[in-house]
Each structure stands twice: as C-alpha cells, then as structure tokens.
Amino acid sequence: MNFTVPVQAIQSIWSVGKESDDAIAEACKPPFCIYFSKKTPYTVTNGSNADHGDDEVRQMMRGLLYNSSCISAQGHTPLALYSTAMLYPPMYGSCPQYVKLFDGSGSESVDVISSSYFVATWVLLVVVIILVFIIISFCISN
C-alpha cells in the first residue's frame, strides 16, 4: 500500500490594499495536493498587519506544523488522511477521505471498484471452501 502524503498549500491572500490571485488554487488539485482556503475576509487583528497574515491564515499555518492535512475530533494520527472511519468533519483542514465519502459537491469520488473486487474475491473464496467441505462430507457419508 502506498501512503504518499499529499502536498499542502495555503491560499496566498493579501489584505484589501494588495492584489491577490488564485494561481495556487488552480495548480493544487487532489489527491496529490490539498488546498486550504480562507473562509473569511482578511482582517488585521491581534497585532498582525497587512503583510503577515491574519488570525485565520495563522491558524492554517499552525496546522501545518503538525505535518498533517487534517486533525479530527479524535486527534491527529499519521494515518488520519486515509481513515475510512472518519465520521465527523475535521476540526482543522480538509480530510480527503471525509470529502470523498460525504461531500457530494466535489469532483472526487470514492474508488469502490477495487474494494468491491477485494470483497468479491473473499466471498468467492469462502463459497469455494464451503463447497469443498460439502463435497468431502458427502463423499465420506457414502
């Protein structure tokens, strides 16, 4: 299994007085890149200024210090990116598995074909084993 951790990118937005573009958002596409975008307008508070990020940007950057793309309510684990048990929205970031399973608006979809083949293979194996036991018991009883 390949557990390649995607690149993480944060929206490079300036204050109202400076021009911003969305080049990073256009370049960063899942599953190889996870893009964190601001949800509120740029605000200068708590001693920050127009050039060094507002509170929301600082919070997003703080999350990167954990080397994690998402932190769930259960805490951070290195495999949080790939957890299929992600039932709650992340407290920070955007967990790809959560987005794929529960967000119908995205272009990403869950790869159910490979997992279906895996389940079908095991079911077939169990059926074959049961049939072998039935045949053996039939032969022994005769």
Swiss-Prot record:
UniProt topology in membrane: Single-pass type I membrane protein
Primary location group: virion
Keyword vocabulary terms for this entry: Disulfide bond, Glycoprotein, Hemagglutinin, Host cell membrane, Host membrane, Membrane, Transmembrane, Transmembrane helix, Viral envelope protein, Virion
Highest taxon of source: Viruses
Intravirion side: 139-142
Annotated compartments: Virion membrane; Host cell membrane
Gene Ontology biological process terms in this record: fusion of virus membrane with host plasma membrane
Side of membrane Virion surface, spans: 1-117
MF term (GO), any: host cell surface receptor binding
Membrane-traversing stretches: 118-138
Pfam families the record matches: Hema_esterase
Glycosylation sites: N2, N46, N67
UniProt cross-references to SUPFAM superfamilies, sorted A to Z: SGNH hydrolase
Signal peptide: none
Disulfide bond residue pairs: C28-C33, C70-C95
GO cellular component terms, A-Z: host cell plasma membrane; membrane; viral envelope; virion membrane
Post-translational modification note: N-glycosylated.
Family designation: Belongs to the influenza type C/coronaviruses hemagglutinin-esterase family.
Remaining remarks: The truncated hemagglutinin-esterase of Berne virus is probably non-functional, since part of its active site is missing.
Subunit-structure text: Homodimer.
Name of the featured protein: Truncated non-functional hemagglutinin-esterase homolog
